[in-house]
């Protein structure tokens, strides 16, 4: 109660309490006391349980996993995945991939649903995972490393008329709305769904629309500008979600 009152006195735009679903009665009691003392009732987000594929963690049964051990295991598994793909170990990059994978796996699930954490799925480079998003980001950087010297004041956007390009442009336009929805509803999964959709659309664009070998230089420049915009929005989404960027995958 004292902590909640202290938060009320900080003049923040929002006062939010994050609790497990099993703490709903506790919050009602705290909120009632705070209101009775003359303070504004804080908002609350009730999260469901996080469980491993092996089952629910339980202190009584001795199946609780400490966060420190959990994250250490995540790094080990991420580095193993990197070695399998590249034949070389990279612990620093493994940390970024692992931490991002754990965060994303939990953020992509709506708060009222239990999170079933699966190592194999979380660290997969395909599907709705952080490694897949990071791989898409790295692919964009690879293209830009080969051609980034365009005159952005002389771009013919009318050349971006391929159906996939139009879908990407519309999706980029929707990003602020996705952020606003996530903010108002306290729902980070709105951003994860958006980021995954953007990565999928970019992958389709990558295979359907040549960038460096387009029909002419004007179309190449327009497509370079488009993927620059995709990169910026991806970085913004990753920043909101707390995902760590990597230079290569």
Predicted regions, residues:
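Non-catalytic interaction-recognition regions
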Residues: 1-249
């Amino acid at each position: 109660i004292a902590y909640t009152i202290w938060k009320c006195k900080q003049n923040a735009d929002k006062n939010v309490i994050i609790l497990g679903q099993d703490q709903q009665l506790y919050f009602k009691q705290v909120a009632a006391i705070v209101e009775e003392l003359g303070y504004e009732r804080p908002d609350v987000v009730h999260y469901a349980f996080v469980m491993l594929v092996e089952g629910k963690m339980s202190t009584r049964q001795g199946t609780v996993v400490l966060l420190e051990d959990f994250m250490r295991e995540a790094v080990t598994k991420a580095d193993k995945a990197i070695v399998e793909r590249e034949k070389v170990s990279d612990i620093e990059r493994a940390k970024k991939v692992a931490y991002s994978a754990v965060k994303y796996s939990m953020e992509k699930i709506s708060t009222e649903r239990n999170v079933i954490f699966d190592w194999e799925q979380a660290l997969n480079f395909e599907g709705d995972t952080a490694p897949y998003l990071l791989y898409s980001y790295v692919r964009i950087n690879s293209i830009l490393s080969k051609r980034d010297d365009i005159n952005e004041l002389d771009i013919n956007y009318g050349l971006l008329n391929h159906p996939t390009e139009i879908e990407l442009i519309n999706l980029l336009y929707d990003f602020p709305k996705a952020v606003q929805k996530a903010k108002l509803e306290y729902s980070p999964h709105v951003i994860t769904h958006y980021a995954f959709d953007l990565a999928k659309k970019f992958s389709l664009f990558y295979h359907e629309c040549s960038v460096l070998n387009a029909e002419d230089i004007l179309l190449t420049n327009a497509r370079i500008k488009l993927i620059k915009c995709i990169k910026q929005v991806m970085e913004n989404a990753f920043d909101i979600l707390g995902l760590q960027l990597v230079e290569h995958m």
